Design a protein with these regions (language model features):
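Metal-ion/cofactor- or nucleotide/acyl-coenzyme-handling active-site neighborhoods
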Residues: 1-249
């Protein structure tokens, strides 16, 4: 994985299909221009995953809407940008919604959410909904939480808070996701595993090693830090109350 940034990006070709002509394969390609430059910001971002810690924990009961005004300071000098994942659109309007499941992308467009909000998705969804879905630049083909984190890095943010980024716990009959049991998600009693997610996040930490990644943790989560992340000097964990203070929520 190579670090890439919005300031060097004009757009890219995506493959819509492959046809055979005269015995040879040819790709049908479309140029997708870059339409969301987003390089003018405070370099602070909040990436919100769908782990249960963001709705079910002891301590401060923080509403997602608080993140939309966090770190404002004088005239919004330190206000961060918010990135959300998949079905979170039903509960909150982040600055940027990232969707990696084509079925969910269809649902989001049909709901009307994409009419007035920025939604990033994969090439398939962009080709199907060109007026409503924006292409994830140089899509790393990762899970949604990791893709949203990558996008925040791509946009040039240098401090990224990760909220609702929970491990799948050791209970084999528990899905640690807010939307477990709903369409396009695993069953409530089906542990999805987290090794791919852990590996994807580690790749991002290593690639964007000039970014300060901060995972917000609740009671009991501190000990659940993946072993692979412990060696990342640009990654740390922060208790919820300390996060509220540091991020000026």
């Amino acid at each position: 994985m190579v670090n890439k940034y919005v300031t060097d990006y004009d757009g890219e070709y995506v493959v819509s299909g492959v046809v055979v002509k005269n015995g040879r394969k040819h790709q049908d390609r479309f140029w997708i221009p870059h339409t969301v430059p987003n390089s003018d910001h405070t370099k602070v971002a909040y990436v919100v995953g769908n782990g249960r810690s963001r709705v079910d924990f002891s301590g401060v009961a923080m509403k997602l809407s608080f993140l939309s005004t966090a770190g404002g300071g004088h005239f919004g000098k330190y206000k961060g940008q918010c990135y959300g994942c998949n079905r979170i659109y039903q509960d909150w309007n982040p600055d940027f919604l990232v969707v990696t499941h084509p079925g969910l992308a269809d649902e989001i467009v049909e709901s009307g959410y994409a009419e007035d909000n920025v939604v990033f998705g994969r090439a398939k969804s962009v080709l199907e909904h060109p007026e409503h879905i924006t292409l994830v630049p140089h899509d790393p083909r990762m899970n949604c939480g990791a893709t949203a984190t990558y996008l925040a890095c791509f946009h040039g943010h240098k401090k990224i808070y990760l909220y609702g980024f929970d491990n799948q716990n050791t209970n084999p009959t528990m899905n640690n996701n807010v939307y477990a049991g709903t369409e396009f998600y695993g069953q409530v009693d089906e542990n999805q595993g987290d090794q791919v997610w852990i590996s994807n996040m580690k790749r991002i930490f290593d690639t964007y090693n000039d970014v300060d990644f901060v995972r917000v943790v609740t009671d009991g989560m501190e000990e659940e830090m993946p072993e692979a992340w412990k060696w990342c000097k640009n990654f740390r964990q922060l208790k919820t109350w300390d996060f509220v203070i540091e991020a000026d929520i």
